[in-house]
Amino acid sequence: MKKLSAFILAISICGYSTQAVAEIFNTSFTSIYGGKIETQQWAGKPYLIVNTASMCAFTRQYATLQKLYDEYREAGFGMVAVPSDDFNQELSSNAEIKDFCELNYDIDMPMSETLSVKGLSAHPFFKA
């Protein structure tokens, strides 16, 4: 898994500036559960930042993401689900998103508050 993670990371950062790479490794998100999610906690380990939406055709993938997180979290794998309404497919509040995910998918993986993932107002991670 380490070789695969390193390969994916190497491919994903090819052509990016040093500053952009620093943004990827040193970013934080406000948790939908309260507090902060710091990506530095997974330094040297694989992690996934994934844009999500509660009302899109792929919402059922929450269950798959949770299963992936459950399977590898003890090995140090990190994940942040990032809800965004940039595509008009998200519930109207963080509380609704949290409740929806907990009730329908029994989610306990790290999840940020609703963020912008595109354009000038995008979270720095998504601009990197």
Where are each of the predicted segments found?
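Positively charged n-region of N-terminal signal peptides that target proteins for export
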Residues: 1-4
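Cleavable N-terminal signal peptides
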Residues: 8-10, 20
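N-terminal signal peptide c-region/cleavage motif recognized by signal peptidases
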Residues: 14-17
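Cross-family detector of peptidyl-prolyl cis-trans isomerase
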Residues: 20-23, 29, 64, 84
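Terminal helix/beta-alpha structural elements that buttress the NAD(P)+-binding lobe
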Residues: 25-26, 113, 127
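A short beta-strand-turn-helix
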Residues: 26-46, 67-72
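Short pre-active-site segment immediately N-terminal to redox-active cysteine/selenocysteine motifs
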Residues: 45, 52-55, 83-86
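Structural microenvironment flanking redox-active thiols in thiol-disulfide oxidoreductases
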Residues: 58-123
